[in-house]
């Protein structure tokens, strides 16, 4: 049984991690931390978890207790894992970080986007970017895993087949992405209030979103060179979900794009390439660790449109983190993650 610790268990990704781990036959949550809720039972804060964690309580972070775990997940704001990851790694504990702390390979670039110096630059060389569809073999040997963000997951999975094959003009990529409000976190913000977000949709961070360098980094690795990416995120009046509409110029009109995508993801348990002509819906992935993709070439032209949908809290965060844990410990990748999406 894998002994699990969770740092930061009161946000949406933390409680989603608890929900998924409750169904995992080979993992047990030993420690969950929250400074503000120390002493509160998990089941009292989240009644959906009653019967699963009736005795588990939030506690103040304690390096010794966390270091006794086999793996520790960080479901925290950026900067927290910087301070604790090194000590846990020294104790022999594997670290899976759901924050952005170790996603970017360049410490200076991280500092520019997150407005503070990187707190653990010495760990960046060994941090493995936890996108299993790209880095599965590296994940198997990792000590420190950086779980990709939600927009980066949907965007990279949608564009990687075209870039790996050298088919797309990498200098003219567009990612037009929509997110549910849970992507903004559980903290109280005016823009997340029902009266503000309901029955409305808006673009934001058009000048530059923190996920832009992460997406670009992944696409550069796929293409083997520089990329030019325009990334525009939008906030939509739904709780969960990411819908990415991706545009790429593909001059070769003879290539069978459907076959290309099906071949690339044929052995991926959590990527579903839908039949030609499909339009994947966010509701089709709600609560599930799956990315559904459809590829189109409108009017047979050079502009290819890829539609990619995920649940931002599952494949875009906690589910992908658990998928990484399964790989890391040599388990069936689907363990605890094979449940169907919720409909309606």
Swiss-Prot record:
EC number: 1.2.1.38
GO biological process terms, semicolon-separated: L-arginine biosynthetic process
Catalytic machinery residues: 150
GO molecular function, one term: N-acetyl-gamma-glutamyl-phosphate reductase activity
Reaction(s) this enzyme catalyzes, per UniProt: N-acetyl-L-glutamate 5-semialdehyde + phosphate + NADP(+) = N-acetyl-L-glutamyl 5-phosphate + NADPH + H(+)
Localization per Swiss-Prot or TrEMBL: Cytoplasm
The family this protein is said to belong to: Belongs to the NAGSA dehydrogenase family. Type 1 subfamily.
Task performed by this protein: Catalyzes the NADPH-dependent reduction of N-acetyl-5-glutamyl phosphate to yield N-acetyl-L-glutamate 5-semialdehyde.
Protein name from the UniProt record: N-acetyl-gamma-glutamyl-phosphate reductase
Species for this entry: Pseudomonas aeruginosa (strain ATCC 15692 / DSM 22644 / CIP 104116 / JCM 14847 / LMG 12228 / 1C / PRS 101 / PAO1)
């Amino acid at each position: 049984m894998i002994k699990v610790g969770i740092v930061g268990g009161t946000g949406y990704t933390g409680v989603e991690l608890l929900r998924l781990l409750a169904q995992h036959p080979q993992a047990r949550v030993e420690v969950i931390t929250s400074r503000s809720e120390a002493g509160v039972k998990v089941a009292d804060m989240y009644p959906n978890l009653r019967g699963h964690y009736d005795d588990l309580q939030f506690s103040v972070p304690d390096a010794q207790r966390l270091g006794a775990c086999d793996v520790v997940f960080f479901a925290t704001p950026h900067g927290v894992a910087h301070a604790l990851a090194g000590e846990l790694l020294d104790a022999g504990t594997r670290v899976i970080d759901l924050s952005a702390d170790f996603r970017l390979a360049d410490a200076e670039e991280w500092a520019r986007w997150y407005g503070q110096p990187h707190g653990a630059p010495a760990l960046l060389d060994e941090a493995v970017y936890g996108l299993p569809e790209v880095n599965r073999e590296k994940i198997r040997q990792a000590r420190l895993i950086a779980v990709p963000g939600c927009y980066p997951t949907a965007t990279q999975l949608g564009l990687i087949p075209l870039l790996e094959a050298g088919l797309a003009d990498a200098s003219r990529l567009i990612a037009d992405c929509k997110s549910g409000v849970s992507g903004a976190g559980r903290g109280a913000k005016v823009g997340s209030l029902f009266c503000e977000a309901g029955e409305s949709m808006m673009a934001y961070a058009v000048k530059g979103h923190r996920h832009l360098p992460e997406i670009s980094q992944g696409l550069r690795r796929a293409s083997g060179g520089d990329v030019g990416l325009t990334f525009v995120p939008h906030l939509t009046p739904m709780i969960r979900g990411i819908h990415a509409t991706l545009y790429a110029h593909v001059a070769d009109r003879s290539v069978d794009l459907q076959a290309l995508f099906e071949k690339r993801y044929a052995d991926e348990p959590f990527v579903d390439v839908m039949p030609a002509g499909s339009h994947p819906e966010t509701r089709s992935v709600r609560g599930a660790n799956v990315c559904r993709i459809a590829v189109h070439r409108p009017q047979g032209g050079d502009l290819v449109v890829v539609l990619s949908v995920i649940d931002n809290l599952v494949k875009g965060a906690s589910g992908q983190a658990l998928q990484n844990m399964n790989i890391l410990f040599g388990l069936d990748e689907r363990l605890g993650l094979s449940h169907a999406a919720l409909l309606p």
